[in-house]
């Protein structure tokens, strides 16, 4: 149990997808204007990561891993296309659920919801799972923790950006300029966790 708690904390803070690996920056910067929208996208990312990492773990271990289906057959060259297909299917299902049951959130997320399919944070989580050879249980914890870490980062950035509307930002830095600086300072703050050994 202690191993899973340390993996969860590690994936949220120490190996944060957005602020340590800089994955998923396109939606991270574009959707972080309002806390409410950022929170909704963060929840969607948590759901997709929590489901796609373990599902892709099963697909990899049962089908794609060398000698998984038949001894001597290595289908690992199909990793990328298979993982993207699984992620796309899960995002499509999530999109239909949000459209049916949460129309305001679906409309607020707009084009960014289908973009979760190609969000490199999602694909990064799946790739790290394969690279680190996580078990099924570890992949569930890692997927959930990575999603929570990404949501924590985007909601924090959105909160800061909402407060910056009332600040005296120099004209040359307004918009994405000050957002990049803020994200960089947040990443420096999260770097302080890198010395923690779990």
UniProtKB/Swiss-Prot annotation:
Compartment(s) where it occurs, according to its Swiss-Prot or TrEMBL record: Cell inner membrane
InterPro entries cross-referenced by the UniProt entry: NqrDE/RnfAE (IPR003667), NqrDE/RnfAE_oxidrdctase (IPR050133), NqrE (IPR010967)
Main localization (coarse): membrane
Transmembrane segments: 11-31, 39-59, 77-97, 110-130, 140-160, 176-196
Family: Belongs to the NqrDE/RnfAE family.
Function as written in the Swiss-Prot or TrEMBL entry: NQR complex catalyzes the reduction of ubiquinone-1 to ubiquinol by two successive reactions, coupled with the transport of Na(+) ions from the cytoplasm to the periplasm. NqrA to NqrE are probably involved in the second step, the conversion of ubisemiquinone to ubiquinol.
Entry protein name: Na(+)-translocating NADH-quinone reductase subunit E
Annotated source species: Vibrio cholerae serotype O1 (strain ATCC 39541 / Classical Ogawa 395 / O395)
Protein's gene: nqrE
